């Protein structure tokens, strides 16, 4: 197996393991997307790495209704060491080893996690033939960082003082993109909607898509994000990318946003999950304004 021989990794397998390090838990299909290898070929490689205890896994169990949870792989400490030595990066550049924040069992939230990671992988692969843009970094809520004495989702922040529950925001994911020609950087947040959240705002304290949009509006106006993400660039605004299950739900989300600030509609872009994961940087994105029928891109097309 030329992709993995002894302790030597091929460049493609290295890319796949780097994605495992970034995103903690990935399916065979997701590692294949990151590496560019065929899933049928990669599946055997991952099994070998798991037998050698470089990888661990969860899932691959039956679910209610007769369906089956996919098998998700993660790096063990020995796998991290193999990756570090294979790609020649110091730990300070690769990032320290972190075990996935997950128990040994499959949970319903995993479907949301996988859909979110699919979108981040679409960002990565979508830039492969766009050399004028560089992905600076990615964030996602399932990656924990230590703040004070507790571990928090790395995307968690507060839209304003005081730092109370009503002001807390936790984007599903985010990324920073740089235009290599201008040197300017853009900040993007991703919201992955699986169709389970109420669309319109209800009682105070209840969760809804419109309520989440309103929280992002406060985040935009308060500019606290500029300090939080200051280490990655100078940002005066951000763009929220809302990816949902169907075109019908997308249009209903736009209708539910009709009473929100019209001046902030351009900072919110919507698409379906299926289209987003396959054509992320193509002209697929609609404004939050239900009256606007135009599809736009997130970057300039030369």
Describe each PLM feature range.
Residues 24, 35, 77, 142, ...:
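Short, flexible loop/turn elements at secondary-structure junctions
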Residues 42, 57, 126-135:
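Short secondary-structure capping/junction motifs at helix and strand boundaries
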Residues 11, 67-68, 114, 168-170, ...:
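A generic fold-level signal
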């Amino acid at each position: 197996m030329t992709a993995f021989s002894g302790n030597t990794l091929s460049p493609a397998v290295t890319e796949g393991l780097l994605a495992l390090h970034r995103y903690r838990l990935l399916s065979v299909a997701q590692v294949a997307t990151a590496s560019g290898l065929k899933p049928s070929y990669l599946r055997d490689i991952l099994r070998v790495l798991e037998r050698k205890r470089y990888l661990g896994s969860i899932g691959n169990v039956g679910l209610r209704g007769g369906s089956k949870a996919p098998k998700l792989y993660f790096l063990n400490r020995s796998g991290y060491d193999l990756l570090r030595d294979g790609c020649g990066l110091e730990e300070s550049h690769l990032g320290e080893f972190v075990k996935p924040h997950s128990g040994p069992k499959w949970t319903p939230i995993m479907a949301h996690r996988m859909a979110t990671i699919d979108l981040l992988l679409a960002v990565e692969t979508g830039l492969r033939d766009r050399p004028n843009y560089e992905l600076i970094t990615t964030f996602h809520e399932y990656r924990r960082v230590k703040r004070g004495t507790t571990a928090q989702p790395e995307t968690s922040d507060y839209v304003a003082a005081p730092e109370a529950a009503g002001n807390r925001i936790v984007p599903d994911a985010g990324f920073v993109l740089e235009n290599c020609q201008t040197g300017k950087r853009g900040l993007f947040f991703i919201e992955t909607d699986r169709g389970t959240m109420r669309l319109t705002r209800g009682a105070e304290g209840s969760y809804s898509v419109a309520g989440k949009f309103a929280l992002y509006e406060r985040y935009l106006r308060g500019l606290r994000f500029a300090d939080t993400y200051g280490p990655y660039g100078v940002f005066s605004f951000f763009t929220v990318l809302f990816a949902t299950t169907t075109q019908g739900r997308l249009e209903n989300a736009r209708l539910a946003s009709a009473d929100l600030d019209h001046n902030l509609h351009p900072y919110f872009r919507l698409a379906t999950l299926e289209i987003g994961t396959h054509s992320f940087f193509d002209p697929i994105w609609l404004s939050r304004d239900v009256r606007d029928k135009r599809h736009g891109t997130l970057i300039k097309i030369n």
